Regions:
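Thiamine diphosphate
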Residues: 2-154
């Protein structure tokens, strides 16, 4: 991908784990939350990781590529350990890959707290807006307070 396509600097992070098919990259290891980043949300996932760490909650951050079939076993193992999953997906499609991960995690770890952050839909039908906004304070509060058992869409 050309730098001109992205207004952000590219992150150069050390890897903790790479899936055999290069579908999943893990950048951090933690026991308090699992963060799965789809599309171009790895920088936001790392920022959320840092904000959680400031509140005493460590997290595992994964970047997920769109590879079929999906092997998210390392993410599901992390959720089984942490009990919390945050999916960040800034894709413009209405068929977000993040929803498929939420479904698999719900089956594998039904007691886990599951939150997905997507683009805001300002219109009933059509193309999603270019903005992707995360209310980090509200998200961190949700994660460090008593976990909800119901999936949440933000």
């Amino acid at each position: 991908m050309s730098q001109r396509h992205s207004p952000k600097e590219f992150l150069q992070l050390e890897l903790v784990h790479v899936a055999r098919d290069s579908a999943v990259f893990q950048y951090t290891e933690g026991s308090g939350a699992t963060i799965a980043c789809f599309n171009f949300t790895a920088p936001e996932g790392i920022l959320l990781h840092q904000k959680l760490r400031e509140r005493g909650l460590t997290s595992s951050v994964f970047s997920v590529n769109n590879v079929f079939p999906h092997d998210w076993s390392c993410i599901k193992q992390s959720v089984a350990r942490t009990g919390r999953l945050v999916v960040l997906d800034d894709s413009k499609s209405i068929n977000l890959l993040g929803y498929a991960l939420l479904h698999e995690v719900a089956e594998a770890c039904p007691a886990s707290q599951r939150i997905i952050v997507t683009r805001e839909a300002e219109i009933d039908f059509g193309v999603s807006p270019d903005t992707f906004h995360i209310d980090y304070d509200a998200l961190v509060y949700r994660l460090v307070s008593e976990p909800s058992k119901e999936p949440t869409v933000v």
